[in-house]
Amino acid sequence: MPSDCPRPSDASSGSDSHPASRPVSRPVSPVSRVARLARLARLARPRLTPSYVLAHVALYLLACLLLQTSPLATALPGYTGPHAVGTVDLELPLARPVVTSPAVRKLDASPAFRLETVLLSLYYPTAQGLRSVVVLLSPPRRRRHHHHHYWVPRPVHLTARGFARFAGVDNPVARCLCWLAVWLGAGFVTIPAEVDAPLLPEHAGPLPVVVFSHGMAGSRTHYSHYLGELASRGVVAAAVEHRDGSSPATVVQRAAAAAAAASSSSARPVVHFDQSDLLHPDGSAVSLPQLKAQQLAFRDAELLQALAVLRALHAGNGSALHAASSRGEGAHLPSFRGRLDLAALVLAGHSYGATGALQALAHPSAAHVAGAIVLDPGKQSGPLRDQVRVPLLVVHSDAWSRAATDFFGRPHFDAVRDLAAGALARTNAAWFLTILGTSHPSVTDAPLLYPLLMRWAAGAKLGAREALTQYVGVSLDFIHFIKTGRRGDGMLGQNVTHETYDKWVSKERQQSYPEDLARLWQVHMRM
């Protein structure tokens, strides 16, 4: 064996005979270990490339789609009263369609203000722990358990087109962008009330009733939390959907049999329109004041029809209403027989809806209305009817009272104060208050869905839930007054603090007014 080749014995015994040739193991210092981990972290760290960001956004949107959650909106919270809340959509045909104003659409010369059906959402108290079982009457018959209404009514693309028209950019690109915004913003938001749940058991006694009218660019779903909170405390609230062109979009849906008899489609979409879309029968243009008068007349007719529905419900016609409704809900309507306290019926509205509610009070069919709740009565919706002859509660948002708006030659705040003063003189029961830190949309669901956006856009300082708590509390106090004649210990029992906005009536009143109320309320007029 050549002498320069390693021998097996050398290899096997090298560790003993040649210790210097063995590698030396050196301890790793903590600093070196940290450095190695840092290098590994840099290698593992994703690079924020456009493709990486888009991939993660796509995964997030896909997860939202699969889970049916809206990526840009917060879920509506549950109700806090002692009762759970049920809801039913009812759309009922008139015995004979009514044309409330002669204006026609430019597009097809069809009547712009033709009232065929009335659509309303009922919110009512139900027992805790119940789950809905919805049986749809129209084919195919199917049962849906634990069903909730969507906050954005279907089809979504109609609502998107309505918002595009509000923005004045009704073209295919704008519609697509609005559709995407609506889907991402609220497409899967649901109202946390159980559809078709049974009414609270009869031992609860007669239930007070509120009929509510939504504002411009709103719909019957946009006040679901305010009305649901009332329902969770024993009130039956009916939110009316207005088809006067002031809503982004709505669908007039007649029962299939009625539509077949009339040889027409069972669904007629109504997308937002304004005076530029209308003509008088003689071909002349419709002015903005004329449009508002026609819209309010149409709203009055819808509110009066809603009152008639509630009277029929109380009279025991629930089964007939269920059968006539094109929405397929209302299996428990017969249980409403004799359950409504129509002697304590309150007509309410927000913004444009508040103006309409005041106007509807003048109609003989509204003679049995016991009181009115007026939230931010409209500034651009025409004159306010000031001959109110029922107890009246006017609640302004902070933004509504603070802005010095000209209203037919005088400050809007002064006009509203005189409205309340007239009601006080005629009925000895009227209040005018401002909730501090709130904005015009504070009574709607929008601040709950988009808290940061609404604070930035609308300027509200009071939290969304606290604001709604105040609206609900003062409304319940007023309903209690209508029912019992007693003001209670809430805001209706407080003396005047500010006859004009943000100006104390006296230093003595400022010192006597509780601090916890002073940060929230100004009382401008009281019984």
What residue spans do the PLM features occupy?
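N-terminal membrane-anchoring alpha-helices
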Residues: P27-A84
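Domain-level recognition of soluble alpha/beta enzyme cores
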Residues: A63-V210
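Active-site machinery of serine-nucleophile hydrolases
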Residues: L136-W179, H222-A285, A429-F432, L436
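Gly/Ala-rich beta-loop-alpha elbow adjacent to hydrolase catalytic centers
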Residues: G215, A348-A357
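Alpha/beta-hydrolase active-site loop
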Residues: D244, T250-L342
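Alpha/beta-hydrolase-fold serine-hydrolase catalytic core, especially in secreted/extracellular enzymes
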Residues: P2-P8, S12, R33-V57, H440, ...
